[in-house]
Amino acid sequence: MYKRPGFCEKPDAARGQRAVGHLTATVAALLATVGQADTPMEPRFAPVPVPHHVYDGGWEHFVGGGLAVLDCDGDTRPDLVAAGGSNPPILLRNTSDVGRPITFVDATPPALDLTATTGAYPFDANNDGHLDLMILRVGPDVLLHGKGDCTFAPAPLDTGDHWSTAFSATWEAGQSEPTFAIGHYVDRADPEGPFEACDTNSLWRPTPMGHAETVLEPGHCALSILFTDWARNGRPDLRMSNDRHYYIRDGQEQLWAMEATPRLYTQDDGWARHTLWGMGIATRDLDRDGRDEVYLSSMGDQRLMEQQGDGPAYKDVPFARGTAAQRPYIGDDGRPSTGWHIAFGDVQNNGRDDAFIAKGNVQQMPGNAMEDPNNLLIGMADGSFAERGDVAGVASMHRSRGAALVDLNGDGLLDLAVVNRRAPLEVWQNVTANPGTWLSVALTQPRTNTQAVGAWIEVDDGTAIQAREVTVGGGHAGGVAGPQHFGLGTAQTVKLRIRWPHGDWTDWQTVPTNQNLSLTRP
């Protein structure tokens, strides 16, 4: 995916001068004029000033740069933790008032005084109701137990010395403790590397004595992994997206069946070989058929894939759907794009999912675009997608990496945060005029798996059913723990039901829209 270490890295001071984060318009001014937008529901975002933070470092930090979103102090406002690479991570505590301009303060605790970090994923690892952080590193990873006040304490976990770039977690049937997996990139100890020197990956399952490691091999330089119940049979399997730049010939995308002894799905199961410069995984039921499409970021074409039949067979959607996003859509750099984090979400609340793709050159790869703006692909009524990144104001030219679409100020609109390599972290507030209705659904369970990882939520607005799985993992080096957001168009009420982890469906219940709904498993 990039050159060997040691090639020339040019200064980065001038990069991103046209970036949206440098616009002088304030959020407050845009909020005051938002009703005057030319086109109803045309997406609009305004840059938000935030404490300075940069993801930096040499060759080992060309990848990574993840962003974790979690409510670390129980005030229902999403806080941010951004990996720093050679810099320490930062924790931005959300101080926003509902419906007002987004504000953050730097509240980085001593436990995050770490270097060589590549990513961060939030989940409740010890079932105490406080969200924890898995910090991925070039070196030993660190699990931090949350204390409920945005401070953390290191947990006793030894995952070895690897170049960690991906993470996912789930709760398997009959288990009170989580199963988690860590994806590793190049084996730095291989003297023949870095090419054709991909490290193995690790699966950690609970035992009476803690967790035991199962080595998942072959490894193909994973940059994103995700436990997902793709078959909707109650068992999450482990998808891996891998970087062909380093596995060269013999690798491919992978899907591990989480049986007593994990095994790879093969052609005999219907699995088809796919190769790409896999950077990130996102899943969403875009066509409302009850099955998730899979969106994989890469160099050149981004790959949106649909399941074929009941098995693990996937094929690319037609190019005409508008999801390839293979080249910059503004500027005069016609070289292929480089995609990283993909985040689905309905930014206009019109009932159709949209997709944000963080873009940016690895460092100075001459075969790929240097002026490579982020994408905001807006879902259209016919199932296609239309580019609106420039119109919306999020077409940053920085080297973007991790990202999140999440409601940061409780107004029912999804806002945007992006980590950049060798450039400041950016946050944008969604100020779209005349949006549709929405529903936010937060699930909790008592005693174990407090965030209901593995649950499915279905919301019926009378025209279609949106199905959503609660997961931990995917993306590029970071993820979101929090309520699930549904855009609902003109619906004033919807029907809702839950399939709790390893349980049955609840009855349908009718609820009003435009509210934050919290449900606890009986």
Q: How should each PLM-predicted stretch be described?
A:
Residues 58-62, 110-114, 157-161, 215-220, ...:
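Surface loop/turn motifs at the tips and blade-to-blade linkers of beta-strand repeat domains
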Residues 64-72, 93, 117-127, 131, ...:
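Beta-propeller blade termini
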Residues 37-38, 42, 46-57, 152-154, ...:
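Gly/Ser/Thr/Pro-enriched helix-cap/hinge segments flanking short amphipathic alpha-helices
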Residues 46-58, 109-111, 267-272, 317-333, ...:
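Surface-exposed loop and turn segments in beta-propeller and other repeat-based domains
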Residues 38-45, 88-107, 140-155, 192-212, ...:
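Beta-propeller blade repeat segments, especially FG-GAP/WD-type strand-to-loop junctions
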Residues 77-84, 131-137, 178-185, 237-242, ...:
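Hydrophobic beta-strand segments that make up the repeating blades of beta-propeller
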Residues 151-153, 159-258, 262-282:
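Solenoidal tandem-repeat scaffolds enriched in leucines and small polar residues
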Residues 49-87:
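Beta-strand-rich domains and repeat architectures in extracellular enzymes and scaffolds
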